[in-house]
């Protein structure tokens, strides 16, 4: 009958609508979910965290970056299957502690992000993440210590990007100690000053080298027996155009990490050779 056909058509239409809605939900979830750990991914975290901070600018938050210490060794010793299981266990542990009152995500590799309100309870929960016990091949328990860097956000400033707060949490994470259980570190103003100095050094090092701001000094070497100078040690200082003399203890570690130390070494060699040639020419 016509009524039956109308009913069937309505059912088909409803089924199509339900399917379309389900597909939209599925693809949206797929877009925002990390395929391995099944927790939100960084894209979802960034979008949602900004909304939370914008809508709660009167509250204080903690933005946390964490990863597994020596995760590469876990992969090398036990294989990638165990490595993946470790990441899933970390995600499960984070989810169990913060699913009610926090935002969390897998950022990349073995790195995870957490955003929670700054309360004593949440600080204790973050501290409790430090050590994770996992089972290897269902027999061996293996302790996986986590490195945790936390950036406090007393009042959210929209002028500062969320990426900046994440960078600060990552900097704090680098300060975590390998001794005892000191695997959690909070970002401080002192770290900020060191970060600003590092950024200044890296942004100006090439210009400074080309402009001859690195000055070579010669420290005499004495032979005590004869009380005579037998040589000299070449020392370099950075005579910055605005900041004045910068100690090598400040810029050398930065150069050693980013590889610019090679350029500086060749510059010093060149200055030493020029000095020696000048002395030979002068007789």
List each language-model region with its residue ranges.
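Signal-transducing coiled-coil linker helices
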Residues: 2-35, 42-53, 193
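Nucleotide second-messenger and two-component phosphorelay signaling modules
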Residues: 31, 50-62, 66, 77, ...
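Cyclic nucleotide signaling catalytic output domains
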Residues: 104, 147-157, 161-179, 185-200, ...
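Catalytic strand-loop-helix junctions within cyclic-nucleotide turnover domains
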Residues: 115-124, 140-141, 145-165, 172, ...
């Amino acid at each position: 009958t016509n009524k039956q056909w109308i009913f069937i058509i309505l059912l088909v239409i409803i089924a199509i609508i339900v399917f379309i809605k389900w597909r939209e939900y599925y693809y949206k979830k797929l877009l925002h979910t990390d395929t391995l750990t099944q927790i939100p991914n960084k894209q979802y975290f960034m979008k949602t965290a900004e909304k939370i901070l914008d809508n709660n600018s009167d509250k204080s938050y903690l933005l946390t970056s964490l990863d597994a210490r020596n995760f590469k060794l876990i992969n090398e010793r036990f294989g990638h299957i165990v490595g993946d299981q470790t990441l899933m266990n970390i995600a499960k542990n984070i989810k169990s502690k913060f699913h009610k009152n926090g935002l969390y995500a897998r950022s990349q590799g073995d790195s995870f992000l957490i955003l929670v309100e700054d309360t004593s309870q949440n600080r204790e929960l973050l501290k409790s993440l430090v050590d994770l016990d996992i089972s290897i091949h269902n027999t061996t328990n293996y302790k996986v210590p986590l490195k945790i860097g936390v950036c406090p956000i007393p009042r959210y400033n929209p002028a500062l990007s969320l990426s900046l707060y994440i960078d600060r949490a990552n900097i704090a994470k680098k300060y975590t100690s390998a001794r005892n259980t000191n695997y959690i570190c909070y970002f401080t103003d002192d770290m900020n000053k060191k970060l600003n100095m590092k950024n200044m050094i890296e942004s100006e090092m090439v210009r400074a080298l080309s402009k001859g701001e690195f000055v070579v000094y010669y420290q005499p070497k004495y032979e005590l027996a004869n009380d005579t100078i037998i040589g000299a040690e070449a020392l370099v200082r950075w005579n910055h155009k605005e900041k004045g003399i910068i100690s090598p203890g400040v810029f050398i570690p930065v150069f050693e990490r980013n590889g610019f130390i090679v350029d500086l070494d060749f510059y010093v060699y060149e200055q030493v050779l020029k000095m020696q040639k000048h002395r030979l020419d002068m007789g």
